[in-house]
Amino acid sequence: MKIIHQPADLAIGRGKACLAIGMFDGVHLGHQQVFRQTIEDSHRNEGRSVAVTFDRHPASVIAPDRTPAMLQNRNQRLRAIESLGIDDVLLIEFNTAFSRKPGAEFIRELADGFGMIHSICVGANFTFGHRRDGNVGLLRTLGQALGFHVHGLQAVSLDGQAVSSTRIRAAVRTGDLDAAGQMLGRTFAIEGIVVEGDRHGRELGFPTANLDTNGLALPPNGVYAAHARLGQVTHRAVLNIGLRPTLANPDPSLQVEAHLLDFDADLYGQAMEIELVERLRDEQRFGSTDELATQISRDIERARTLF
């Protein structure tokens, strides 16, 4: 899959670009049907399927105080899109200037840049452009004028409700990871860069990889059995999310740290993806670090029975 930053970077024939447009946070079941339709269009037209998406959530520019916690970081999102068979991604920098662009202007620029579009596929409730002045109706009007087809697909339903990134975030936040996984079509996973911690885990005999998960949706604090993926290699792990109340810290901050079973190496600066297998217990305050170490040993032994 090729990642481009402007339509002209992709040399394809006139009328061969089949576009899916959206933020696609989570690349959930609803997004997946949009991509399937886009890929089907490209195969029928001997064209290219192109996901048009943004480098950051629009709310982070338009209303930073209302930016949602993201289900994926950018690399996760792009990998998920690639896994579905999309040919190319147009990754647009969403900045203040772009946020002020009317929807019709955005679509006309795409059509000009790609040298005419064959089709655009979006969700039925998709909006775009300055002050959300664009919707499926505007796309259909522009499609008639510019010669492209429009698919406005109805949401995928699960248990009688529409699958959406908002609904999945709520499921993650409350710890309903089974529901989140069903809506995502895969196990919920957190990815972050391994950063330097305070080495308390190593002092207890259980070295951990501390992840930078700033801006990501996280499940409730607690201990989880997990799979930790480093590149193409997966390790069994125990994940802790919380404030580590047993450790003396007058100003605790949320930590996301993974102990990889039967593994010990310097991982600083590497990307690690954590798939949550099962919640083991709530976060607890212990009377001593010895009691904490004993409980961690029990957590590890229980986790081993789950893999």
Protein language model features and the residues they cover:
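Glycine-rich, Lys/Arg-enriched anion-binding loops that position phosphate/diphosphate groups
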Residues: 143-243
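N-terminal catalytic cores of NTP/NDP-binding nucleotidyl/phosphoryl-transfer enzymes
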Residues: 9-73
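N-terminal Rossmann-like or analogous alpha/beta NTP/dinucleotide-binding catalytic cores
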Residues: 60-146
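Residue-level signal for inorganic ion chemistry
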Residues: 28, 81, 120, 180, ...
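Phosphate/ribose-recognition catalytic cores of enzymes acting on nucleotide-derived substrates
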Residues: 13, 197-307
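Short acidic-hydrophobic, aromatic-tinged amphipathic segments that line or gate anion-handling sites
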Residues: 2-9, 69, 90
